[in-house]
Amino acid sequence: MSAPRHILVAVAWPYASGSRHLGHLAGAYLPADIFARYHRTVGNRVLMVSGSDVHGTPITVRADEEGVSPQEIVDRYHAEFVSNWDKVGIQWELYTSTGTDNHHAVTQDMFRHLAENGYIDTKTSEQLYDPQAQRFLPDRYVEGTCPHCGYESARGDQCDNCGRQLDPTDLISPKSRLTGATPELKGTEHYYLLLSKFQDRLLEWLRGRQGWRKHVLNMAIGFTEEGLQDRAITRDLEWGVDIPEPYDTIGEGKRIYVWFDAVIGYLSAAKEWAENTGNPEAWRDWWENPEAESYYFIGKDNIVFHAVIWPCQLLGYGGLNLPTDIPANQYVTFKGDKASASRGIGRSIGWYADRLEPDALRYALT
């Protein structure tokens, strides 16, 4: 009999900024749970992890809109997510959040390693600034027209319509979500992940993937072949993971970018799980063991972050396993529109979970 395989099941981290819709369950969480259950049944060692993403502008924008603290928003929706997973029978080894001390420490450790290895540097760039609110407008604090597909409600970090990654300065006719003002350009210093240094290694790795879904591989290779651009990994925000010493000298009010820290959550969750089991080094069996396998269950809009940026972070850190597969699903539609939590399209997981037995709901979605 062959030895049990080590299977890491890494599942997308939902923003704790609002209820998640049925597309999230059908596209990421239920497939991951079925996959993990199978591997447990046949005797493999499964580590299925995820958690609530508690940083970034989705949370701070919601808090600003409601006039409450970001922590109040996080506490509300993290509790809702945990309840929903229980209702629909999702079985985790660990469901945590990016708000833990452990996650902050692991994120800062990766930041330091990448900086020490020459993959992070500072740059000054012009970013959108709201003259009325007198503050910079990172990510979802600005909306405008997508330069790629013409969608008129694209956000400053990504277009919901075509899925392309964006910078706020890419938007056509941008408007501040704080005041409705037309932003100005103003210089600000930030840390950048030097993705351009990974161009050849990443492309070689991607071209060697076999068995991946065509739309995942085509998107990742296409994005990389266009030429990887260095990407800012800090933001002008008060909410998020602190920039670690000795790199915290570029100015007040800056934090690590949410997507740099969110994908690190798969690693920090594994370390937290290992600590909880009383064997703090157990995480290495899934992350440093060359025979271990890792599967990332995500939605289409997260492909670039998981198939391009996260592998670059892992390559730059060194010694950690790259993804075995990234079985990302396409968008779920609701009455003809793409289901979207940020745009309020589609019913929430909780709405269905409160009305249907879990087995009936799971059967209908598979």
Predicted segments with their positions:
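N-terminal, positively charged nucleic-acid-binding surface of large information/translation enzymes
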Residues: 2-205
